[in-house]
């Protein structure tokens, strides 16, 4: 399944993996998964975190290594994000709930994820998704961006 991913996708997933793998040991633990989920405004229980790990933990060692992570991401991409997941993700970014993601909101979430972006990088991300050119991302633009990945 992971062999259907492009090199670019694999390198993006490697970057995402290292955001989760806080101590850089090559595996994601329930603790690390919890940290990232909480930084995204989610509040999973220990049991939910364990379930998430168990779903992709092919060798049953209780952690996720990069090949397992790739399999999970490939599976997720195949099940293309449901409308509900996209709505939830939009809410995470749209901090003030006004229906738009501003550059400041985007920067805030990315910083919480451990991604230190320059103003130019944030502006570039907004520009790429901002179809109507108003300088922010509305829900329709967000959906298009999520489905075009």
From Swiss-Prot:
- Provide the record's note on post-translational modification: Trimethylation of Lys-116 observed in other calmodulins is absent here.
UniProt binding sites for Ca(2+) 2: 57, 59, 61, 63, 68
PTM-bearing positions, type N-acetylalanine: 2
Q: Which residues are listed as membrane-spanning?
A: none
Sorted alphabetically, which InterPro entries does this protein's record hold? Answer: CALM/Myosin/TropC-like, EF-hand-dom_pair, EF_Hand_1_Ca_BS, EF_hand_dom
Q: Which residues form the EF-hand domain?
A: 8-43, 44-79, 81-116, 117-149
For this UniProt entry, the molecular function terms from Gene Ontology, in alphabetical order, are: calcium ion binding
What are the alphabetically sorted keywords of the record? Answer: Acetylation, Calcium, Metal-binding, Repeat
The protein's superkingdom reads: Eukaryota
Annotated Gene Ontology cellular components are:
myosin II complex
Q: Report if keyword Repeat is assigned.
A: yes
Positions with a binding annotation for Ca(2+) 1: 21, 23, 25, 27, 32
Residues binding Ca(2+) 3 are 94, 96, 98, 100, 105
Query: Which residues hold Ca(2+) 4?
Result: 130, 132, 134, 136, 141
User: Note on file?
Assistant: This protein has four functional calcium-binding sites.
Q: What does this protein do?
A: Calmodulin mediates the control of a large number of enzymes, ion channels and other proteins by Ca(2+). Among the enzymes to be stimulated by the calmodulin-Ca(2+) complex are a number of protein kinases and phosphatases.
| Similarity annotation | Belongs to the calmodulin family.
- Put simply, this protein is called Calmodulin
């Amino acid at each position: 399944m992971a062999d259907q991913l492009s090199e670019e996708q694999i390198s993006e997933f490697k970057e995402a993996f290292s955001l989760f793998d806080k101590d850089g040991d090559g595996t994601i633990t329930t603790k690390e998964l919890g940290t990232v989920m909480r930084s995204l405004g989610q509040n999973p229980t220990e049991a939910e975190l364990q379930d998430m790990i168990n779903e992709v933990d092919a060798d049953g060692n209780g952690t996720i290594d990069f090949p397992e992570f790739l399999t999970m991401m490939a599976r997720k991409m195949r099940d293309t994000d449901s409308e509900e997941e996209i709505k939830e993700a939009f809410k995470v970014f749209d901090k003030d709930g006004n229906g738009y993601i501003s550059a400041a909101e985007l920067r805030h979430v990315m910083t919480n994820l451990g991604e230190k972006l320059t103003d130019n990088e944030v502006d570039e991300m907004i520009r790429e998704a901002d179809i109507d050119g108003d300088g922010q991302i509305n829900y329709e633009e967000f959906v298009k961006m999520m489905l075009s990945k």
